[in-house]
C-alpha cells in the first residue's frame, strides 16, 4: 500500500463497486461511492454497510456516500466506473461535463458495448475524448472475498503508465491485495468479457450433468477462443495466461459465486433464460456479452465455436445437448 493518501470516486454501489470502494478506503484513501438509487444510497449511508450484497462488512470511516452523479464525478480527480456494461456509455456521457481538469478515468466493468460488441475503451474515447488518461482493472475477483480482505490479485492496464502505477499503488495491500501492471490494454478488456460467455457454457455443462471432463475441455478450448480473438484484435497472447485471462476464466467457470456460472447451471437444469436471470437477482453480464462477443468474432472473422453454440442456446433456443453434440461432431483437427 502506498503511504500517500488520495481521493477516489467510485461510480456504482453494487457488490463489486462497493468492494473496491471498501478496499480503497481501507488503504486510507478518501472514497466517494455513488449509487444510482437515492433511497438505496441513503440506506447505505445510515447503515454504514451494503446490507444487500456485503452485509457483514462495515464501511471504513473514509468512505462517504453520494447520490448525485455529477457531484460524485466532480468531487475527485480519479474516477473509477463500476457499472454494468449496458450503462457504461451513458454514465460516461453524463459525467463528462462534471469531470475535474486533469481527471483520470478507470473502469472495472467487464463486458463489451451492447449491440455493437465494441471494446469499452472505444466507448470511453468516444464519450470522453482521447486526452483523458484511461485505465481498466480486471482479474479473478469475487466481491465478497475482496471486501473481506482475502488474498486477491488483479491486473491493471492504462493508456498512461503513470496512471496504471497510480492505480496499482492505490489498491495494493501487502496483506491481501496485489496488482500487476500490464501494457496490453486490449487484452485486459477482452478477457473480462469472453470469460463470462465460457462460464455460462461451463455452468450449462455441469447443469446438464456432463461432468468434470466436459467442463475442463470447455475451459481449455474457451481459452483458445479468447486467445484467437484477442490476437486478431491486436492483443498479446501471453496476456491470456495471466490474471485477466486464465485466472478470471478458471474462477468464473468453477466457483458458484459466479453469476454467469450459476445462470448456466440453472439453464442446464431446465430453467428458461428469463427464470434463470430472475433467480440470480443481479446483473448477469454474460447473457449480453454472449451476443456481443459473437458479433465481434463474426466482424473480426474469428472462429469461436463454443461462443457460437452458447449464442444459439441463449438467443435461438437451441437444445443444449444438440449444441454439445455440434461441438463434439466438428471435423477432427490438430489442437
From Swiss-Prot:
InterPro entries given in the database record: 6-PGluconate_DH-like_C_sf, 6PGD_dom2, G3P_DH_NAD-dep, G3P_DH_NAD-dep_C, G3P_DH_NAD-dep_N, NAD(P)-bd_dom_sf
Residues annotated for NADPH binding in this entry: 15-16, 36, 110, 143, 259, 283, 285
An example Gene Ontology biological process: glycerol-3-phosphate catabolic process
Function (record text): Catalyzes the reduction of the glycolytic intermediate dihydroxyacetone phosphate (DHAP) to sn-glycerol 3-phosphate (G3P), the key precursor for phospholipid synthesis.
Chain positions recorded as sn-glycerol 3-phosphate binding sites: 110, 139, 141, 195, 248, 258-260
Source organism of the structure: Pseudoalteromonas translucida (strain TAC 125)
Residue stretches spanning the membrane: none
Name this polypeptide is given: Glycerol-3-phosphate dehydrogenase [NAD(P)+]
Catalyzed reaction equations: sn-glycerol 3-phosphate + NAD(+) = dihydroxyacetone phosphate + NADH + H(+); sn-glycerol 3-phosphate + NADP(+) = dihydroxyacetone phosphate + NADPH + H(+)
Enzyme active site: 195
Principal subcellular localization: cytoplasm
EC number: 1.1.1.94
GO CC terms: cytosol
EC top class named in words: oxidoreductase
Superkingdom classification of source: Bacteria
MF-aspect GO terms: glycerol-3-phosphate dehydrogenase [NAD(P)+] activity; NAD binding
Family listed: Belongs to the NAD-dependent glycerol-3-phosphate dehydrogenase family.
Alphabetized UniProt keyword annotations: Cytoplasm, Lipid biosynthesis, Lipid metabolism, NAD, NADP, Nucleotide-binding, Oxidoreductase, Phospholipid biosynthesis, Phospholipid metabolism
Originating gene: gpsA
